[in-house]
């Protein structure tokens, strides 16, 4: 009888342990497959494309690639003598028309005072018209001078924000044209994460929810908050023909690939450029609060590690 009870107890304990293990593994599997997470996430940052507003030869480059610069710091300089001469020419035109306008103003004033008793109405009107023409030319010359002054100022290209110089492709002696991108400036303290979540997991993603970010190849877990969810993505299976009619690609009803939607995550602490914009990471949305690691089971910890490195 004791042998039978002992055997039954061992069997019952084994069954209970198997059931508990199955439940733990099942919960870990559900946690792994159904909770909001993705390995398709990238660090991003605000990038300022810097292009000169004037054309000319580059006479000096003051920075090097990947250098951290401050707002207002000189990046490079474009040939200034040409624009200095243009400003001097414009200033000379302004001085000339100022003198001419003064002469024509005196002439028109004298004729208006004398009136039709001393000369014809046509001569008076002609003097007034000449004055207006000269005043117009003066205003135009002043505008040209101001533009020349602005062009001269813009031969010195400065950093509009604090950030890192990236992909510097200008060198002393090169000719650069107006509007051509010369430097990409990665704005400091603007890093965030774009996580491309499957549409099936968006129900567990809301602005304000907490998130964990694990950079690829790193054991460090960063904290962040869901900032926003994209309002729409492109429908790749629908286009329009040349007559505006909808064209829908054929697909298999039993094969439906979940669309990925960008989710923007704001980092709690800016990581400078330790993980540059464009590098990948794993993102897990933990809900309204951060995950309490002390409450995780062994299987959940395994599932979490699989997400990060699997």
From Swiss-Prot:
Residues annotated as transmembrane: 12-32
Keywords, comma-separated and alphabetical: Cell inner membrane, Cell membrane, Membrane, Transmembrane, Transmembrane helix, Transport
Annotated function: Forms an efflux pump with AaeB.
Induction text: Positively coregulated with aaeB and aaeX by AaeR.
Similarity annotation: Belongs to the membrane fusion protein (MFP) (TC 8.A.1) family.
Name of this chain's protein: p-hydroxybenzoic acid efflux pump subunit AaeA
Cellular location(s): Cell inner membrane
Membrane topology (UniProt): Single-pass membrane protein
GO molecular function list: transmembrane transporter activity
Pfam families named among the record's database cross-references: CusB_dom_1, HlyD_D23
UniProt source species: Escherichia coli O9:H4 (strain HS)
The organism's place on the tree of life at top rank: Bacteria
One annotated Gene Ontology cellular component of this protein: plasma membrane
């Amino acid at each position: 009888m004791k042998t039978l009870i002992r055997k039954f107890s061992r069997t019952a304990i084994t069954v209970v342990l198997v059931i508990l293990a199955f439940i733990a593994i099942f919960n870990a599997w559900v946690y792994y497959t159904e909770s909001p997470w993705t390995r398709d996430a990238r660090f991003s940052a605000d990038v300022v494309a810097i292009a000169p507003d004037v054309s000319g030869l580059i006479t000096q480059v003051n920075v090097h690639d990947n250098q951290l610069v401050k707002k207002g710091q000189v990046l490079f300089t474009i040939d200034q003598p040409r624009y200095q001469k243009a400003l001097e020419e414009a200033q000379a035109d302004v001085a000339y028309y100022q003198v001419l306008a003064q002469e024509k103003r005196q002439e028109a004033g004298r004729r208006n005072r004398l009136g039709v008793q001393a000369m014809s109405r046509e001569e008076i009107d002609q003097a007034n018209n000449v004055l207006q023409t000269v005043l117009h030319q003066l205003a135009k010359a002043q505008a040209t001078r101001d533009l020349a002054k602005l062009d001269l100022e813009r031969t010195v290209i400065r950093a509009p924000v604090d950030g890192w110089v990236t992909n510097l492709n200008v060198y002393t002696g090169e000719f650069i044209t107006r509007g051509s991108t010369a430097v990409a400036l990665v704005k400091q303290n603007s890093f965030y994460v774009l996580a491309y979540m499957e549409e099936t997991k968006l129900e567990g993603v809301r602005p304000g929810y907490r998130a964990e970010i694990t950079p690829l190849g790193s054991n460090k877990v960063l904290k962040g908050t869901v900032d926003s969810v994209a309002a729409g993505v492109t429908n790749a299976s629908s286009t329009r023909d040349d007559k505006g009619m909808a064209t829908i690609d054929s697909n298999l009803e039993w094969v439906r690939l979940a669309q990925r939607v960008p989710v923007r995550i704001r980092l709690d602490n800016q990581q400078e450029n330790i993980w540059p914009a464009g590098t990948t990471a794993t993102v897990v949305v933990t809900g309204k609060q951060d995950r309490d690691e002390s409450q995780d089971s062994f299987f959940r910890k395994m599932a979490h590690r699989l997400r990060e490195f699997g």
